[in-house]
Curated annotation (Swiss-Prot):
<feature type="region of interest" description="Disordered">
    <location>
        <begin position="342"/>
        <end position="382"/>
    </location>
</feature>
<feature type="modified residue" description="Serine amide">
    <location>
        <position position="210"/>
    </location>
</feature>
<feature type="propeptide">
    <location>
        <begin position="1"/>
        <end position="179"/>
    </location>
</feature>
<feature type="modified residue" description="Threonine amide">
    <location>
        <position position="194"/>
    </location>
</feature>
<keyword id="KW-0964">Secreted</keyword>
<protein>
    <recommendedName>
        <fullName>Neuropeptide-like 1</fullName>
    </recommendedName>
</protein>
<dbReference type="GO" id="GO:0007218">
    <property type="term" value="P:neuropeptide signaling pathway"/>
</dbReference>
<feature type="modified residue" description="Serine amide">
    <location>
        <position position="244"/>
    </location>
</feature>
<dbReference type="GO" id="GO:0005576">
    <property type="term" value="C:extracellular region"/>
</dbReference>
<feature type="modified residue" description="Tyrosine amide">
    <location>
        <position position="260"/>
    </location>
</feature>
<feature type="propeptide">
    <location>
        <begin position="285"/>
        <end position="299"/>
    </location>
</feature>
<keyword id="KW-0027">Amidation</keyword>
<keyword id="KW-0527">Neuropeptide</keyword>
<feature type="propeptide">
    <location>
        <begin position="321"/>
        <end position="588"/>
    </location>
</feature>
<feature type="modified residue" description="Tyrosine amide">
    <location>
        <position position="318"/>
    </location>
</feature>
<feature type="modified residue" description="Glutamic acid 1-amide">
    <location>
        <position position="281"/>
    </location>
</feature>
<keyword id="KW-0165">Cleavage on pair of basic residues</keyword>
Amino acid sequence: MQCIPKKTFMAMLRIPEVRSNLAAYLRTALMVQEVKNHDDMVHLKALSSEENEDFEICIPGGTYLELFRNPVLRSHLSAMERSYKFPGRFLSEEVDSRDLIPESEKRSLATLAKNGDLPITIQERESDNDDEEKRSASSSDNVGSLHELFDEVSYRRRTPEIYDYLTEQDPEVLEYSPDKRNVGSLARDFALPTGRRHIASVARDHGLPSGKRNVGSLARQSMLPLSGKRNVASLARYYMLPQSGKRNVAALARDSSLPYGKRYLGSLARSGSYPTRDYDEGKRSIASLARSGDWPSVAKRGRMTSGRIMARVLNRRYGRSLSDDREAPSEPLDLQQLIRQGNSEGKENEWQATPFTVSEDLDEGKAKNRSNRRIEASQTRHKRQIDFSDEYPLPVMQNNMLDYEDMMEAIADHYPNAEKRFMGQTVSQPPLRVFRRVLFSYLDVMSTVFCRTCNQVEPHLLQTEKIYHIYVCQYQQIYQPHHVKDNPNTNEPTTMYNHYVQKKCSPMSSSSTHGIITVVRENPADGSSSNYTPDASTRSLRPIFTPKTRYLQSLHGDCRHGFKRFLLLPDIDNFLRTSNSHIAPRSM
């Protein structure tokens, strides 16, 4: 018999499931009249008595199990037992096993687990020996199992603190039985061995061997196995790549870590590191091959180049450096002509190599080059002879005092060779009027110098005028201005030698000058020439000459400024041909 206080039993009757089960049980007991013990009916009739509140109601074990088979009812009953703390006891220690556990009741593990009748406690789980003894117990020992069941209930009555606390905090705890052993029930009842054990809870509680172990946490804490982050960008930033730094082509080229250094075309050309074969060395452009004679041995249409042609190329190539003379041959090297010549020597349908001796051809070409490279002094240079001859065969005039013989020689030669010498563009001859104005400007200056000496003419000045007289004659012979007509703006004739003006310095006579072109001044129409002083200005007798070239400077001012450099050199025609010189007449 299971005895419970009347107050607790009345509270349980308020539950619809208990009330319906108890009413069905009472109807069955009254109708069948099969009550084995008269005391049972006495105790059941006492339910309607309200005399004593402390009266205990005892229910047979079979009825108790039948009433509270539902797990929800059992949870309510256990909660009420913990709340009211009533001691449960058996009125009769001798309980018939047939009343408690019928023979027809199933004892499978699933049924016991579903009904919450598994005889497992926390103490028994912690003790391995007790667990083994419990598992080895005989299933037919129903009395022992019942004792263990009620011992568990009594244990929970002795230790109700945690359940009382949970009941006060959360009334829904009463809906769950603590006898359930699934993981969810154990987790809700905090019955797990050391709390919740899934990875997230362990990681939050820092229960992992070394904290959180995911890749993000390890990367943030620099706890990756190989010193920090291991992606390619991080390794490249920290120079931790396996091959000592960044391995892209640009980085290897900057660090000169390529197997053969830098391999682009410019570097190969500067270092001469082209892929060499048996015939190519250094630069491979057509101009380089033509200069060095390193044509490949294969010609057009798969034919082989004649050996004699290559020997001639070698003669042309090495003959210049083997000779003692530093002058180049007089004729340029024409490889195409040599190839055509060698092709004509062979057969028409066949290209065959002609046997030759390189040493004989080299000796022959060397002797021929020595004889051809001797250039006379009067012969001009070719374009490819710049490095093997002097820049100017004639002396450069650096002062005003010209040697008469040198000047005559330069004028007589006048560069008769028609080959190209200067890199500039060839221009046409200057007009005669331009040359005439420049010459008259110079003679005007010379006349001022004559007047300044007061009847004393220095010999070198006379010689200088003679030189320019000769140069005027040479100009007439070279350019032959046969199309020159009289200038309509002036009354000057076309002939230069008829410009005579009245001469002031009387000691100068035509017999003493011997054909020197003299410039004298006429008396003005309203007076004599006595107004002309030795220091008179010559601005009225010469035009303004304003060139942009610094080699042609006109003499401005009086003759007391001295005789500056204004000599007509042999190359004056080159200066006069330029468009930078502008001659403008000045009014008197």
